[in-house]
Every structure is written in C-alpha cells, then in structure tokens.
Amino acid sequence: MPNIVLFSGSSHHDLSQRVADRLGLELGKVVTKKFSNQETSVEIGESVRGEDVYIIQSGCGEINDNLMELLIMINACKIASSSRVTAVIPCFPYARQDKKDKKGAVERWSRAPISAKLVANMLSVAGADHIITMDLHASQIQGFFDIPVDNLYAEPAVLQWIKENILEWKNCIIVSPDAGGAKRVTSIADRLNVEFALIHKERKKANEVDRMVLVGDVKDRVAILVDDMADTCGTICHAADKLVSAGATKVYAILTHGIFSGPAISRINNAAFEAVVVTNTIPQEEKMKHCPKIQFIDISMILAEAIRRTHNGESVSYLFSHVPL
C-alpha cells in the first residue's frame, strides 16, 4: 500500500494541522505564493511518486484564489505520479449555485449558471480522483462528479454538543429557519427524541416585507435553530427574534458552515441567541474575538478518520452516525 501524504492549502492551516496531528503525520512541504501579476504559484517540496495524497483546502476566505490554488496543487501532485489525489474540501465552494434559480424575471432562468457543476468539472480535470467534503448545501452536487464523493455529516458531532452543553436538551425543540432544511432538523429531532418546528417565509407582493410564519409550538422550550450554513445571518437572527416572541425560553443556533460575512457579526451580537455554534470547516478565531456568542465544534477528528478509512480501503459510512474518538 502506498504511503499517505497530507498537504495543506492556504485557506485553513489550523484545521489541516489538527487533522495531521490526529493522524500522527507531518504536513507535507508545499510553498504557495503569488507572482507580481497575481498568478498563483505552487511548489510541492517532496516526492509524491506512488503516494496516496490528500490536500485539505476549504472554500472560504479568498475563495477564488483558494480554489485556483487547490486546482494547481491537485494537478502538481497528479503529474508528479502520485497514485491517488483526494481533495478534502470541508466547505465546498459555490455550493449555493447548484441549479438554475429564479433571480427576478422568469426569462432570466435560462441564463443562470450552475457554478457548482463547473467547480466539479474543474476538480476532475485538474486530476482529483476522490473528493471528501462535509454537509453539502445541496446533496445532488455529488452527482455532478464522475469520481467518488464522500459527503460527511456534522450531525453526530452536533448531537454530542447538544447533549454535553444544553442541560435542558430533553425539553428542546429543533427548528429549521426555512422549509428547505426540514429534512435536516427532523433527522436531529428524531435522534434526540424531541419535536421539531420550522419557519416559513411568506413571500409578499412587491414593496411589502416578507413575513415569517412559525409552524410548531416553542412556548417554554429551548429552541435550537439548525442549518447547514449562515452568511450574513439575516434569516437566523430574524428567526431567533420570532422564536423568543413565540415564547421560547432560550435560543441557540447550530450551523455547519459559519461564513459570517458583511453585517453578520453585529447581527449576532444584537440577536437573542444564547450561543451560535459552528463547526471549524471555516476559520472562526478572528470572528470569535468580536462576537463572544460564537462557539465552535472541532470536526478534525471526523475528517481525519475519513482520511484514515479511505487510505486503508475501509467504509466511511460509520462516520454518518458516530463521532470517532
């Protein structure tokens, strides 16, 4: 069996180091830089001939630069005769652009790009043999690839966090901030043996504000909002206010991917949250300095175990329902 080599891109070195430590590995030598014209340069600093290569690069920060860096790293390892190249992408870039969506007038549908499919094509053409990611925004993105894709889930780690950190978890209710997340929250609610609710955004006519309609009873319960990602946090912060006004005793938000761009931090600080809990698929250190409500769940053990099992030819489905030690 070939040896395993683990490389880190520039997007999230802390997570890469955590994964390497759990695997008992040193991160491979790689130098990334930019030329004066802003082209990305990558130099792999060690032999990868015949090796099983894993490159960790999350879709965050300077997303376009980091995506290009990942593509170049994949290609550099592939043409250096590695036996297999796996791209480990904790937060998949462009995942929200997964279909032709209505963005105004109906006639604009035909001109909307499906950028997630384009990213899938680029990764394959660059030379990736396998993709490991987490909580894809749309699970059908797996079908955009002609190579194996392992979509891991943060759910087991989320369940563990709830049981360890919310004393009243048996009296909680799991809430989806929109109808699209109903399947996610029902799965968590079933495993906790609690009820679920959802918030439906009722679209108004032009020049009228959308109205949020709560479906479910949260009175005198701890409400836990669950979603796969939050960007500017307008939806979840309005949802938190709605839950408090409906009688929830406390409100938490648990998200896999905390993007937190634009006014997100100020909105969270001013919202009625006890805590906003995210995984570390995206770096959160700087944001936590400005927002004490943000906490994170470390998912490096899930990624590390997925890499170990993939390298050894073992099934990764165990990770869909268990948190590795």
Swiss-Prot record:
Binding site for Mg(2+): D135, H137, D146, D150
Region Binding of phosphoribosylpyrophosphate, annotated ranges: 219-234
Catalyses which reaction(s): D-ribose 5-phosphate + ATP = 5-phospho-alpha-D-ribose 1-diphosphate + AMP + H(+)
The protein's role, per its UniProt record: Catalyzes the synthesis of phosphoribosylpyrophosphate (PRPP) that is essential for nucleotide synthesis.
Gene this chain is encoded by: PRPS2
Membership in a protein family: Belongs to the ribose-phosphate pyrophosphokinase family.
Amino-acid positions noted as binding ATP in the UniProt annotation, renumbered to this chain: R96, Q97, D98, K99, K100, D101, H137
Pathway as given in its UniProt record: Metabolic intermediate biosynthesis; 5-phospho-alpha-D-ribose 1-diphosphate biosynthesis; 5-phospho-alpha-D-ribose 1-diphosphate from D-ribose 5-phosphate (route I): step 1/1
Gene3D superfamilies, per database record: 3.40.50.2020
Name of the protein: Ribose-phosphate pyrophosphokinase 2
